[in-house]
Structures are given as structure tokens and as C-alpha cells.
Regions:
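Catalytic phosphate/metal-binding cores of nucleic-acid and nucleotide-processing enzymes, i.e., regions
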Residues: 1-133
Length: 133
């Protein structure tokens, strides 16, 4: 349970399992006063009506592709997009990543808790600044 078979035949964690590990660690750090985080949920809510699944549209101001987790740490704004080893960004996620970086934020595609721990404890400017027009 919580595993998915990769194309290579190896078994890897599902995105939800990776996210749960990350959130557990972030909660520990938040309780220690070391950061603030918010798990975002951009999936429109659905419900059954007359035997059909009906999806509510996203709330006003909510953006498709927003990172799964937003972290504030020591003046840094960090977007974490959780993916499996083979997961890829959607076009919406790529646009949000550009917006984060253009406006001074950090954005990481993370595939493990260890990667999150490294990125949060080793602030670097890996991304190139996008020149404003």
C-alpha cells in the first residue's frame, strides 16, 4: 500500500505518500518555530448529484498549477511541487514556477523528503532571474 510500480519495474512511493512525509516533517519544524507552511489544495471539490459527479469550479483568485506546499522561512517564500520520480509538471505549473521566480520566490520540484530538507537548509539562488519587460 502506498507504492506504485514504475516503468522500470521498480516500486516507488505515490505522490500522496511523499507529500505526507514532507508535511509530517514540516509540521515538526513549524512546531519548533523554524518555519511556517501551508498545504494548498487546488483540486476542485466534487459531489454526487443525481448519480453524476459534479465538480465545483476553483474559488476566485485560486490559480491552477499553484505548488502543493507553500513555505515561509527566514524571509524566503518557497513553493514545493511534489512529484514522483517520473512525475512531470503541467503547463500551468511551469507558468506558476516562472511567476514565483520572477517575483523573488523560490520554487522546487521535490521528489523526496530528503530533497526538501536539503533545499530548505541550503538557501541558494539556483534559478535565473527572469528579466522584467
Amino acid at each position: 500500500m502506498g507504492k506504485t510500480k514504475l516503468k522500470s519495474g521498480k516500486v516507488g512511493l505515490k505522490e500522496s505518500e511523499i507529500q505526507r512525509q514532507i508535511i509530517d516533517w514540516l509540521e515538526l519544524k513549524e512546531n519548533q518555530g523554524k518555519l511556517f507552511f501551508q498545504r494548498t489544495n487546488n483540486i476542485p471539490v466534487s459531489q454526487m448529484r443525481n448519480g453524476k459527479r459534479i465538480f465545483r469550479s476553483m474559488a476566485k483568485g485560486q490559480k491552477k498549477g499553484f505548488p502543493d506546499i507553500l513555505v515561509l522561512k527566514a524571509g524566503r517564500m518557497i513553493g514545493l511541487e511534489v512529484k514522483t520520480k517520473t512525475g512531470k509538471q503541467s503547463p500551468f505549473q511551469k507558468e506558476i514556477e516562472k511567476s514565483f521566480k520572477k517575483n523573488g520566490g523560490e520554487y522546487y520540484i521535490v521528489r523526496s523528503l530528503e530533497q526538501v530538507m536539503f533545499e530548505l537548509d541550503n538557501p541558494t539562488c539556483k534559478h535565473k532571474k527572469i528579466k522584467q519587460k
